[in-house]
From Swiss-Prot:
The VP6 trimer contains a zinc ion located at the center of the molecule. The zinc ion is not essential for either trimerization or transcription activity of the DLP. Zinc-depleted VP6 has an increased sensitivity to proteases. Ca(2+) binds at residues 266, 286. This is Intermediate capsid protein VP6. Pfam families: Rota_Capsid_VP6. GO terms for biological process: fusion of virus membrane with host plasma membrane. Intermediate capsid protein that self assembles to form an icosahedral capsid with a T=13 symmetry, which consists of 230 trimers of VP6, with channels at each of its five-fold vertices. This capsid constitutes the middle concentric layer of the viral mature particle. The innermost VP2 capsid and the intermediate VP6 capsid remain intact following cell entry to protect the dsRNA from degradation and to prevent unfavorable antiviral responses in the host cell during all the replication cycle of the virus.
Length: 399
């Protein structure tokens, strides 16, 4: 993997900097590195493809070296370099695709394609290394089973989940009380509702709670917490739990009271925030517990218009609702996760779909992320680490 990254980095720099008119002295170090790459690769043969519709291609390396000059690089010099660069780029692209479409239940962190296995040989270590890539650094750590740490802008840690629970229900579904939620990616939205606006609740207050267990531990998380759940702020028709009927939800939004959020690790509270919105920090957690209340305003605090919305007896045409939105803006995770700000999952999925790669023993059909993160096994993590690393290498050359 180190060699593949070094090849890609060298080729990217060469493609960007070996251009007509450039002073040789400005790129002499790069050209020496380029020539070392050519010397190491010359005389070797590789084969890529042969899985799904990815065609088999044979690669032979026999290229001349770039010379020295006291002047600027001319058109002939650049054209010679470009021919070599284009062939090498095509080779790296195919090695990456060949690697991205393969998976293994055992030691999925190790190279799976014949071409990348060959590049891992001792003879290719002479290619100049550049391990500045975060993915490469973490691949090396994961490969040695040492601690890894991945910084993501928006980690897709929550499997998609959209449902509701009813704490009070009737066959007519005309006086309901319960909780709705939508968890996906890096965001949780949860709403508590009571058709009767807590008219018969103790102290005219309804208590709601929403608990989310993460599939992996997050640390040093920057989180936004808002006293609203906009996805549950408009009328809708909802299917009943048994699917035999539908019920009408017509929310009128209240601000939640006594909001408390707890971040827990192995059942122990690590961070606790009460009535605090905006940006908050969670140090280390694998579970999030949100609790909040709906409080019915005293009659003297209701204007006639508000009192008309929430009568003391049925029918209840408007439904009191409170909600919260929790959004993980950034966090550190020791596991490999898809990230809203990166294209690795999209790149891997696109290549696998484009070449009709058959479903293997590790990844679900279509690389369904909800399935992946819901059943996140060590085997899946190893394979994701490898294919995401390769995807990051490929993205240096192929946009």
């Amino acid at each position: 993997m180190d060699v593949l990254y070094s090849l890609s980095k060298t080729l990217k720099d060469a493609r960007d900097k070996i251009v007509e008119g450039t002073l040789y002295s400005n790129v002499s170090d790069l050209i020496q590195q380029f020539n070392q790459m050519v010397i190491t690769m010359n005389g070797n043969e590789f084969q890529t493809g042969g899985i799904g519709n990815l065609p088999i291609r044979n690669w032979n390396f026999d290229f001349g070296l770039l010379g020295t000059t006291l002047l600027n690089l001319d058109a002939n010099y650049v054209e010679t370099a470009r021919n070599t660069i284009d062939y090498f780029v095509d080779f790296v692209d195919n090695v990456c695709m060949d690697e991205m479409v393969r998976e293994s239940q055992r030691n999925g962190i190790a190279p799976q394609s014949d071409s990348l296995r060959k590049l891992s040989g001792v003879k290719f270590k002479r290619i100049n290394f550049d391990n500045s890539s975060e993915y490469i650094e973490n691949w090396n750590l994961q490969n040695r089973r040492q601690r890894t740490g991945f910084t993501f802008h928006k980690p897709n840690i929550f499997p998609y989940s959209a449902s509701f629970t009813l704490n009070r229900s009737q066959p007519a579904h005309d006086n309901l009380m319960g909780t709705m939620w939508l968890n996906a990616g890096s965001e949780i939205q949860v709403a508590g509702f009571d058709y009767s606006c807590a008219i018969n609740a103790p102290a005219n207050t309804q208590q709601f709670e929403h608990i989310v267990q993460l599939r992996r531990v997050l640390t040093t998380a920057t989180i936004t917490l808002l006293p609203d759940a906009e996805r549950f702020s408009f009328p809708r028709v909802i299917n009943s739990a048994d699917g035999t009927t539908t019920w009408y939800f017509n929310p009128v939004i209240f601000r939640p009271n006594n909001v408390e959020i707890e971040f827990l690790l192995n059942g122990q509270i690590i961070n606790n925030y009460q009535a605090r919105f905006g940006t908050i920090i969670a140090r280390n957690f694998d579970t999030i517990r949100l609790s909040f209340q709906l409080m019915r305003p005293p009659p003297q605090n209701m204007t006639p218009a508000v009192a008309a919305l929430f009568p003391n007896a049925p029918p209840f045409e408007h439904h009191a609702t409170v909600g919260l939105t929790l959004r993980i803006e950034s966090a550190i995770c020791e596991s490999v996760l898809a990230d809203a700000s990166e294209t690795m999952l999209a790149n891997v999925t696109s290549v696998r779909q484009e070449y009709a790669v058959p479903v293997g023993p590790v990844f679900p059909p279509g690389m369904n992320w909800t399935d992946l993160i819901t059943n996140y096994s060590p085997s899946r993590e190893d394979n994701l680490q490898r294919v995401f690393t390769v995807a990051s290498i490929r993205s240096m050359l192929i946009k």
